Each structure stands twice: as structure tokens, then as C-alpha cells.
Amino acid sequence: MHREPPKKKAEKRLFDASSFGKDLLAGGVAAAVSKTAVAPIERVKLLLQVQASSKQISPEARYKGMVDCLVRIPREQGFFSFWRGNLANVIRYFPTQALNFAFKDKYKQLFMSGVNKEKQFWRWFLANLASGGAAGATSLCVVYPLDFARTRLGVDIGKGPEERQFKGLGDCIMKIAKSDGIAGLYQGFGVSVQGIIVYRASYFGAYDTVKGLLPKPKKTPFLVSFFIAQVVTTCSGILSYPFDTVRRRMMMQSGEAKRQYKGTLDCFVKIYQHEGINSFFRGAFSNVLRGTGGALVLVLYDKIKEFFHIDIGGR
């Protein structure tokens, strides 16, 4: 008779709206700050990834690498074009990262209930991986159209409004939806789910696992947390980068009368056959630098949760 109240209390905690809302706020604020800081590198990375599929960039005008891209963007499009699409990126990234973090902690409660880290280490480790992957996949289903629009806006290289393909976020979504329907906004969704599970599983799972092995995970020094986060984001980014390249290429097809790829597998095969394996990792170094922003998100998220006095369960 006396076991029922604790059970109800546990159920209440599992679906605590207040805690969930604070998770959204903490993750969103941390993400907005970090993405604005690394926006120029983000745009360079996108251009290097998709220039072979862009009709706006002729073969002879393609960027030779990160440095060439960094030099030519301000010269050809203006200095502030480094932040082109950044507002859309912040709008997209707020719900994406916030939902990732919020769902991650909820999935951790579901997957790790009753798991003892000391006695069931591998089950605990796999639960961390599963919670990270499930959080990323769930969030992607909700915000994919915004991610799609962010990509198309980021690789739009016209100098003035008359040369641009899209006027802004709303214009991009409306034009693609009008020409291809809602399905056009989900171009590349399948490979995105595969890539996001690989990335998020290692991103969240490895970070939480390594921090959990420290003597006092809740009192980890900032520099130690940042170093762990930096290593995790770099490894996760490289591991999932080929999936990201293919999904970006698939996104470039929406709204086009003639399509370059028949599907995800065809895209993988054609990139390998016509451009070589290195093309799957084009812009990867920029992504490593951009990963600094991802590392900051992880660390800032923990600090913001501490500020709001949110219990970081399992850490």
C-alpha cells in the first residue's frame, strides 16, 4: 500500500512540464549564441559541400577550398554575406537543439530507469547512445522543413536581391512547397535520419558517458567539460559527415525540373564514381572548426541548467 505514492511521484517527474520547458529554454539559448558565433564557418562548409550540385556555381567558379571560400565570399558577395541565412539558422536551430536536449533527458529517464552504472556499465552506455539517437531522430521529424530552408538560403550566392534565388525563409518554403508540395521540403529526409542517429548517438551518448566516469560529474571544471565536448563533437561530425553531404545534395534538387540523383543510394554512388571519396568529406575541416560551437552548446547547456537549478539526472 505504501509503494503507490512513490510510483505516482516518479510518473509525475517523468512528464514534468516545468522541467521540460526549462530544458527547451536552456538548450535554445545556448544554441542561438553558439550558432551566431560560428555562422561564417557554417556557410563556408555548406558551400563546399553542395557546390557541385548548385546551378548558381559553374564548374570554373567553384571554390578550391576553405581559404579560397573565405577570401571570395566577402569580395564577391559582401562581408555581411557570411551571416546570410543566419537568422533562419537561429530560428531553425532553437527548436532543433532545444528539442534534442529536452527529449534526450526524457529518453534517458525512459531508457535508464533502474540501470546501475557501476554494475551494468554496458547497459548504461548503450542507454546513453540510444537516448541521444532517439532524441535527434524525434527532433528532426519536427523541424526538417526549417533545416531544408536553412540549407537552401545558406548556399544562395546571388549578390543582390535580384540575383538571389530566395528572398528569405518564408519565400523559400513557399516556393518549394508550391513547386514540389510538402514532400519537396523533406527531400533527403531518409538519409538525414540515418546520419542524425549516428551523430546524436555519439554526440550525446559519448559526452554523458565520459562525464559520468569522472569522480564528480556535476562539479566538472569548465575547461575539462569543454575539452571533452570538443573531442566528442569532432569525432561525431567526421563519423556522420558523408550522410550530411548526401542529404545536402538531395536538398538541392527540390524545385528543379531536372534532377541529378534518383535517390539516396544513387547519390552515394554518383558522388563516389564521379567525384571520388574525398567529396564526401568536402568542407569537413570547416565542420571541425564549427564543432567548437557544438562543444560550447554542450557546456553552456549544463551551466544554464545549473543557473535555473534544473537537476541534471544521471550525470
From Swiss-Prot:
Disulfide bonds: none annotated. Pfam families: Mito_carr. GO terms for cellular component: membrane; mitochondrial inner membrane; mitochondrial permeability transition pore complex; motile cilium; plasma membrane. GO terms for molecular function: ATP:ADP antiporter activity. The matrix-open state (m-state) is inhibited by the membrane-permeable bongkrekic acid (BKA). The cytoplasmic-open state (c-state) is inhibited by the membrane-impermeable toxic inhibitor carboxyatractyloside (CATR). Proton transporter activity is inhibited by ADP:ATP antiporter activity. Signal peptide: none annotated. GO terms for biological process: cell differentiation; male meiosis I; mitochondrial ADP transmembrane transport; mitochondrial ATP transmembrane transport; negative regulation of mitochondrial outer membrane permeabilization involved in apoptotic signaling pathway; regulation of mitochondrial membrane permeability; spermatogenesis. Belongs to the mitochondrial carrier (TC 2.A.29) family. This is ADP/ATP translocase 4. It comes from Macaca fascicularis. The gene is SLC25A31.
